[in-house]
């Protein structure tokens, strides 16, 4: 299993992400150390980048936004998300996009 995601006993999957807000477009950008790097088009103002991140991940996984929760990193580039309702196989495929 990769360092950037883990599955808890309750079935929840935790993702460690490195976010680059203010990019030209929202996209996955490979690995950044022990985190998955994501470029977001949204600016880091008034929580817009956090909202865009949750929407981007939910859309990429085919989940409702309510299945994606920002656990930590509200004001940081390094964020931890909790995701319900998907598999580690699906999550692992995000790094290859």
UniProtKB/Swiss-Prot annotation:
One of its GO terms (cellular component) is cytoplasm. It holds the Pfam family DUF167. It comes from the Bacteria. Coiled coil: none annotated. InterPro entries: DUF167 (IPR003746), YggU-like_sf (IPR036591). HAMAP family: UPF0235. Belongs to the UPF0235 family. NCBIfam families: DUF167 family protein. This is UPF0235 protein Daro_3887. It comes from Dechloromonas aromatica (strain RCB). The lineage of its organism: Bacteria, Pseudomonadati, Pseudomonadota, Betaproteobacteria, Rhodocyclales.
């Amino acid at each position: 299993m990769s360092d950037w995601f883990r599955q808890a006993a309750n079935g929840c999957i935790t993702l460690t992400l490195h976010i680059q807000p203010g990019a030209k477009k929202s996209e996955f950008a490979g690995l950044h150390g022990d985190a998955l790097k994501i470029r977001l088009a949204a600016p880091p103002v008034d929580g817009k980048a956090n909202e865009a991140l949750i929407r981007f991940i939910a859309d990429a996984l085919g989940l409702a936004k309510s299945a994606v929760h920002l656990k930590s990193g509200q004001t940081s580039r390094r964020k931890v998300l909790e995701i319900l309702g998907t598999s580690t196989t699906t999550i692992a495929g995000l790094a290859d996009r």
